[in-house]
A protein has these predicted regions:
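Non-transmembrane, aqueous-exposed alpha-helical and coiled segments at domain scale
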Residues: 4-12, 23-45, 53-54, 68, ...
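Conserved phosphate/anionic-ligand binding catalytic regions in large, soluble enzymes, centered on
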Residues: 8-26, 225-243, 285-293
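Alpha-helical support elements that line or immediately flank enzyme active sites
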Residues: 19-32, 241-252, 297-305
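A glycine-rich helix N-cap at a beta->alpha junction
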Residues: 59-74
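C-terminal regulatory domains involved in ligand/effector binding and gene-expression control
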Residues: 70-201, 209-210
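Accessory "access/gating" subregions that flank catalytic or transport cores
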Residues: 168-284
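C-terminal auxiliary extensions adjacent to catalytic cores
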Residues: 192, 344-346
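Hydrophobic alpha-helical bundle architecture
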Residues: 264, 272-342
Length: 353
């Protein structure tokens, strides 16, 4: 398995596969064809079907247009064989083709194609199944975050510290922002309202309403194209931060314990990414919000003092009750049902404990 640095990434919403990935691809292509006087980008399959709502064209044009005029072609009727999120970049000079590149956005902001599949990145983790890792934990008398440190080295904590800071900053921004989200559905931001209303509720309702507010804050920031952390994706980026932020504010957990919880949750997300997929276009929302709920449930269970077996069971419950969940955004926007789905999944992560 790859490093958690390839799972948790700071980027802009609303979609890691439809925004972050295509922008990253455009940046790579412009480096290899910087002297072109015209670009053409053809989007296939899911990228073309929902790309307008996900601002795929905006992400690509923000990179290529300053260099040369760029044409975007939408082909939702064609799916390339490697992955539903296919892109073809073409560069022209004096109307003659000078470069062509086919690449796929495979989820979580990652890129791949047939060539990269032949030369996969170096594995950081020798074990790729939770059953194997759980056996290691029981044998060594250690837990999941210690396995992460064993494989990644102590430098992972500085990276996770940056990730946690970014998550908190997103929530704070989202809690103070108001107005209507872009895209035409006229969805109003609700996070700040939920937070205010929470103070008038009794204890249990107040706690649940605040959790919803924290999740809505990140999900709404993502929907507006703001800065978020993939956990494991942009579309599911609100679940893990909401759960951990809520626990910090209600239980006063130390920053170190939160970072360890991030490591544990990330490990479960990494296993799902490695053995299946976290791409909504490929496996539906069960691979995004479902995996995010599993990650958050595992992180919360660890903070509550759970054993490795209990942590694994919490993650299992977080995922299994999202199985079959489709990726079905209204008008292709990461808003309905995506925003509220993050909030409900955050609550389910607690229910799993």
């Amino acid at each position: 398995m790859e490093s958690l640095k390839e799972l948790y990434k700071i980027g802009t919403g609303p979609s890691s596969s439809h925004t972050m990935g295509p922008k990253k691809a455009a940046e790579a292509f412009v480096k290899r064809a910087s002297d072109a006087d015209r670009y053409k980008v053809t989007l296939y399959g899911s990228l073309a079907a929902t790309g307008k709502g996900h601002m795929t064209d905006v992400a690509i044009l923000s990179v290529l247009e300053p260099v040369a005029p760029t044409e975007i072609v939408w082909r939702p009727d064609i799916s390339l064989p490697f992955h539903p999120n296919g892109m073809r970049f073409e560069a022209f000079k004096a109307e003659k083709p000078v470069d062509e590149w086919v690449i796929y956005s495979v989820g979580g902001g990652a890129l791949a194609n047939e060539e990269t599949a032949k030369n996969p990145p170096a594995n950081i983790y020798p074990m790729t199944h939770i059953s194997e890792i759980l056996e290691w934990c029981n044998r060594e008398g250690q837990t999941f975050w210690e396995y992460v440190e064993e494989c990644e080295g102590p430098g992972i904590w500085d990276y996770l510290d940056e990730i946690w800071t970014a998550m908190c900053e997103t929530i704070v921004r989202g809690l103070t922002a108001e107005g209507v989200l872009p895209g035409g559905l006229k969805v109003s931001r609700k996070a700040s309202t939920y937070l205010v209303k929470a103070e008038s509720y009794t204890d249990s309702l107040r706690s649940r309403a605040k959790l919803y507010a924290y999740a809505l804050a990140t999900a709404e920031e993502n929907a507006s194209g703001g800065t978020v952390v993939t956990a494991p994706t942009c579309g599911s980026s609100a679940v893990m931060p909401a759960v951990l932020y809520h626990l910090v504010n209600t239980r006063n957990f130390s920053r170190l314990r939160i970072l360890r919880a991030l490591a544990t949750g990330g490990l479960f997300g990494n296993v799902a990414k490695t053995n299946s997929s976290i791409s909504g276009a490929e496996v539906g929302c069960q691979g995004e919000v479902g995996v995010a709920c599993a990650m958050a449930a595992a992180a919360a269970c660890q903070l509550f003092g759970g054993t490795p077996s209990q942590i694994e069971y919490a993650a299992e419950m977080g995922l299994e009750h999202h199985l079959g969940l489709t990726c079905d955004p209204v008008c292709g926007l990461v808003q309905i049902p995506c925003i509220e789905r993050n909030a409900i999944a955050a609550a389910r992560a607690f229910d799993a404990n």
